[in-house]
Every structure is written in structure tokens, then in C-alpha cells.
């Protein structure tokens, strides 16, 4: 789960991370009053959307008067902001964060993430802040600093000293950086986060370190322990189909292709998407129905796939282990009769009760195209939509 910048800063402040401060606006009629409450010489108006690249897209504006701030805020609120992360459709700006500006002497990058490949927690830092870490990695990879933390032993003093040293901090600034590392680590662990990113972390004119922008992503599986964080969820920032799928216990991610996929198991789902690409088409989604899906969940999965107007065909690829193929077949038939599937539907079944499942589909009277293996299924669905 993602949250907005102002929410991320609120959490980090609770853990002792110094951040820039401001006020959030959720209604246009509150803009003027909110800006009047800020007593500052420089105003920073920031669009609050769950995507990076806001600055380059015009979603962050720095102005030097209240009147300018009010005009910029009114112009920005409600626009469709298009960044390199939103896609061409953009994201509507329903919230603004208006901050007091500050002098910036130097910008840094600092984050903490789970490194699944190394089975550890990793700090990533750089003396080049204010730009995407991917851009730093591409242009100046030697400027990226990494420190790994063993979850069994936790954060140690040498981690904090090492990060401060590698970033070039000395004396009081080194002490500040050590405290920030400790605070961010504690926030990461205690909130079940998967990533905390501060970009940029700045040194201001007073020589103090300050988190000027912040992003936190949480592990959905840990949210039940954090109702206060769950309450920060902004459903307007999420794809409605993905939200609907999550509520039904389905793992769904919308993509840009035209072949809908329904699969059980994340690995099989990715293999299915790969082979669709191999045969010359593109998947419209990732959809894992899980190992314990029943008829109703299968029906809901197909309804979600067909809610995407770009879908021209559907490939169902099920390996029956825990899930029985006859249950899948009954769910497919129920969905087809209920919603009227009008696009080509290719079904590949294997595993538990596969012959019974195939028999149910064959006797259904519906126009379902059977496939005997994954390659056959991919070939048939691609040919069917041409």
C-alpha cells in the first residue's frame, strides 16, 4: 500500500526524522484559508498523487507570495497530472500539500528497502539527490552507496557511521545523519514497510539535515496490525479494478495489453504472460486466483477481466493442485452464463480432476476453446483475436 507524501512525513516525524512542514488541502474552497495560515516568505505547492516525477511534470511549484501560491494552487487542484510513472492517462490531483520553502545547500538520496535477492534489509544512499535513483544508477553508478542489515542482528552502530561517512558528513551533520538512519530503520521495522525513500534529503542554510520529500510503501500482509496506517489509504489513487479484486481475495494488476489472463499461482501467471508476448500479443492483466478459489471467486475474476474494455480475448491457465479443475470449469460456465462472455475464451486445464473439468466444459454448450498445453493455449488465443 502506498500513501501520500504528507502522510509519509507525518509518520517519519513521529519517529524523530526532521522534515519540512506544511498543510494539506483536500477541497478547493479551503485553499486560500490554508495558505493564509502559513507564515513564510516562500511557498511550495505540491500535487499529492501516488507517482514520482511530479516536479518535472509541473506538480511542484515554488512561489514567493501568498497571491501567487493561491493562484498556483487553484490552477493545480483537479488537473490530470501526467508523469513518467502515471502512464499517458495521468492521475487526477485531489489533494495538495503546501509547504514553507527553505534554502537548499546540498541534496542527497536516502532510502531503505527489502532486498529479496540477498534476504536482508538494504540502505541505499547517494550524494546525488533530487533525481530518480534509476537515473543515478544509469549515469553515475559509482555514486550509489549500499549497506545491508541482517534482520537477525538488526541495525548496528557501524551501519550508521558508515552511511554518514560515505555521504561525506562530519561532526554535527554526521551525528544528525546517524540519528536519521536509526529513526528511518525503526519506522521501517515497526510499520511493516517495504520501502522508505527520502529524496531529497537536504542540508539547509542552517547546516541541518531535513527530509524534503518522502515516500513510504507498506506490506499489505502486515496492514491488519496497523489500523492507523490502513486508514491513510486513498482509494482514489488506486485502480478500481485492483481494489475490487483485492476485496475478492484476488491478486490483480492491470496492464496495457488485450488478452485477459486468469491463472492460479504467481509463477504460472508470469509464465503465461511471457508466452503471450512470445506469440505476438500482450497481456491485459496479471490475475492470480490463488490455490483455494471457489466458483464465486472464479466468476468474480472473469467479471473483473471483462470490466477492462481493452480485453479482446481471455486465456485461462489452471494447474489443479489444491484447486480442482472441475471447480474451475463450473466457475467458468457460471460466469459465462451470468455475464455473457462475448470474446474468445481459451481454457487450458491440468492436474486434479482434469478429465472431469474438460468434460464439464465440453458438455456446457458454450464456445470455449480447449488447449492441451500452455504453448497451444497461447497460440490459440492469439489466433482467435486476429
From Swiss-Prot:
| Pathway participation | Carbohydrate metabolism; tricarboxylic acid cycle; succinate from succinyl-CoA (ligase route): step 1/1
**In Gene Ontology terms, what is a biological process of this protein?**
succinyl-CoA metabolic process
What is the free-text note on the cofactor?
Binds 1 Mg(2+) ion per subunit.
Q: Which UniProt keywords apply?
A: ATP-binding, Ligase, Magnesium, Metal-binding, Nucleotide-binding, Tricarboxylic acid cycle
Q: Which GO cellular component terms, listed alphabetically, does the Swiss-Prot or TrEMBL entry include?
A: cytosol; succinate-CoA ligase complex
Which reactions is this enzyme annotated as catalysing? succinate + ATP + CoA = succinyl-CoA + ADP + phosphate; GTP + succinate + CoA = succinyl-CoA + GDP + phosphate
Q: What is this enzyme's EC?
A: 6.2.1.5
The ATP-grasp domain is annotated at: 9-244
- Pfam families per UniProt: ATP-grasp_2 (PF08442), Ligase_CoA (PF00549)
Q: At which positions is Mg(2+) bound? A: 199, 213
* Amino-acid positions noted as binding ATP in the UniProt annotation, renumbered to this chain: 46, 53-55, 99, 102, 107
The residues the record assigns to binding substrate are 264, 321-323
Molecular-function annotations in GO: ATP binding; magnesium ion binding; succinate-CoA ligase (ADP-forming) activity; succinate-CoA ligase (GDP-forming) activity
Q: Which cofactor does it need?
A: Mg(2+)
Alphabetical list of PROSITE patterns matching this protein: ATP_GRASP (PS50975), SUCCINYL_COA_LIG_3 (PS01217)
Record function comment: Succinyl-CoA synthetase functions in the citric acid cycle (TCA), coupling the hydrolysis of succinyl-CoA to the synthesis of either ATP or GTP and thus represents the only step of substrate-level phosphorylation in the TCA. The beta subunit provides nucleotide specificity of the enzyme and binds the substrate succinate, while the binding sites for coenzyme A and phosphate are found in the alpha subunit.
Q: Note the subunit structure.
A: Heterotetramer of two alpha and two beta subunits.
Family the UniProt entry places it in: Belongs to the succinate/malate CoA ligase beta subunit family.
Q: Which NCBIfam families match?
A: PRK00696.1, sucCoAbeta
UniProt-recorded name of the protein:
Succinate--CoA ligase [ADP-forming] subunit beta
According to its UniProt entry, this protein's organism is: Rickettsia massiliae (strain Mtu5)
Q: Mind giving the lineage of the organism this protein is from?
A: Bacteria, Pseudomonadati, Pseudomonadota, Alphaproteobacteria, Rickettsiales
Amino acid at each position: 500500500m502506498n500513501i501520500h507524501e504528507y502522510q509519509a512525513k507525518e509518520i517519519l516525524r513521529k519517529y524523530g526524522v526532521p522534515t519540512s512542514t506544511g498543510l494539506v488541502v483536500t477541497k478547493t474552497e479551503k485553499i486560500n484559508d490554508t495558505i493564509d495560515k502559513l507564515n513564510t516568505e516562500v511557498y511550495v505547492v505540491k500535487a499529492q498523487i501516488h507517482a514520482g516525477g511530479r516536479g518535472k511534470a509541473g506538480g511542484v511549484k515554488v512561489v514567493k507570495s501568498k497571491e501567487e501560491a493561491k493562484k498556483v494552487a487553484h490552477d493545480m487542484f483537479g488537473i490530470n497530472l501526467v508523469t513518467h510513472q502515471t502512464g499517458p492517462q495521468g492521475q487526477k490531483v485531489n489533494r495538495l500539500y503546501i509547504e514553507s520553502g527553505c534554502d537548499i545547500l546540498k541534496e542527497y538520496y536516502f532510502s531503505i528497502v527489502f532486498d529479496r535477492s540477498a534476504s536482508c534489509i538494504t540502505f541505499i544512499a547517494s550524494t546525488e539527490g533530487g533525481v530518480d535513483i534509476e537515473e543515478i544508477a544509469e549515469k553515475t553508478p559509482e555514486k550509489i552507496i549500499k549497506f545491508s542489515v541482517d534482520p537477525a542482528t538488526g541495525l548496528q552502530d557501524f551501519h550508521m557511521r558508515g552511511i554518514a561517512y560515505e555521504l561525506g558528513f562530519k561532526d554535527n551533520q554526521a551525528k544528525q545523519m546517524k540519528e536519521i538512519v536509526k529513526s528511518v530503520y525503526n519506522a521501517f521495522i515497526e510499520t511493516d514497510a517495504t520501502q522508505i525513500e527520502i529524496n531529497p534529503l537536504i542540508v539547509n542554510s542552517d547546516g541541518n539535515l531535513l527530509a524534503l520529500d518522502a515516500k513510504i510503501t507498506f506490506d499489505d500482509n502486515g496492514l491488519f496490525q496497523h489500523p492507523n496506517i490502513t486508514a491513510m489509504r486513498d482509494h482514489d489513487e488506486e485502480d478500481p479494478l485492483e481494489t475490487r479484486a483485492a476485496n475478492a481475495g484476488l491478486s490483480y494488476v492491470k496492464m496495457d495489453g488485450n488478452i485477459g489472463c486468469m491463472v492460479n499461482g504467481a509463477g504460472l501467471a508470469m509464465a503465461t504472460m511471457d508466452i503471450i508476448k512470445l506469440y505476438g500479443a500482450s497481456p491485459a492483466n496479471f490475475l492470480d486466483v490463488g490455490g483455494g478459489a471457489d466458483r464465486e471467486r472464479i466468476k468474480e475474476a472473469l467479471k473483473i477481466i471483462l470490466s477492462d474494455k481493452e480485453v479482446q480475448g481471455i486465456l485461462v491457465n489452471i494447474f489443479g493442485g489444491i484447486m480442482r479443475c472441475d471447480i474451475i470449469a463450473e466457475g467458468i460456465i457460471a460466469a459465462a452464463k451470468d455475464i455473457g462472455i462475448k470474446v474468445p475464451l481459451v481454457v487450458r486445464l491440468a492436474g486434479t480432476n482434469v478429465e472431469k473439468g474438460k468434460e464439464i466444459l465440453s458438455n456446457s454448450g458454450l464456445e470455449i476453446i480447449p488447449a492441451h498445453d500452455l504453448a497451444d493455449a497461447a497460440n490459440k488465443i492469439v489466433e482467435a483475436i486476429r
